[in-house]
């Protein structure tokens, strides 16, 4: 079958808006910057995901790892809210999943996190969110790359409450 230039142009003209909409849906949409925190929404697999994140203000114990690559993230997904994670910027050691290898302190509150690859996840997400709302900073301590030494990352919590409220408004809890 041979395509005429007119037919080819018509097909492109008809499909271009569909491609543009699909490309726009794949891009994150910023809900706002709230002091040290940013709130964003993203369509993923036909579902809306909202997350708030802050980058580490200080990182110690891992040479050549910029603090800006280390993030504390709270995510709302249709299948789970208040998912709290730290992206370390390196893979945790393989045996780091026994117990709570990463400890996060917020004021007087201690929170245990388990690890998988380059992330650490809160064991008690609700307690973590409550601590973040009431704290000034969160400090995570855990094993360094290849289990050598200890890494420490400090995240500012200024603006967390507003960023959390923004993602909660944009991705409200499902009614049961």
Where in this protein do the model-derived segments appear?
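A generic "folded-domain core" signal
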Residues: 22-176
């Amino acid at each position: 079958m041979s395509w005429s230039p007119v037919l080819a142009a018509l097909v492109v003209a008809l499909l271009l808006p569909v491609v543009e909409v699909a490309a726009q849906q794949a891009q994150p949409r910023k809900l706002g910057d709230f002091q040290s925190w940013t709130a964003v929404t993203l369509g993923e697999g036909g579902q809306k995901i909202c997350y708030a994140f802050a980058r580490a203000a200080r990182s110690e114990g891992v040479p050549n790892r910029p603090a800006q690559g280390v993030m504390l993230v709270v995510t709302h997904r249709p299948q789970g809210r208040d998912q709290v994670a730290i992206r370390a910027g390196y893979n945790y050691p393989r045996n780091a999943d026994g117990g709570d290898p990463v400890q996060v302190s917020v004021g007087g509150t201690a929170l245990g996190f388990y690890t998988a690859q380059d992330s650490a996840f809160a064991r008690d997400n609700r307690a973590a969110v409550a601590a973040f709302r009431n704290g000034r900073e969160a400090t995570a301590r855990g094993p360094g790359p290849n289990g050598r030494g200890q890494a420490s990352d400090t995240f500012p919590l200024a603006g967390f409450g507003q960023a959390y409220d923004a993602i909660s408004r944009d991705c409200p809890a499902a009614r049961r």
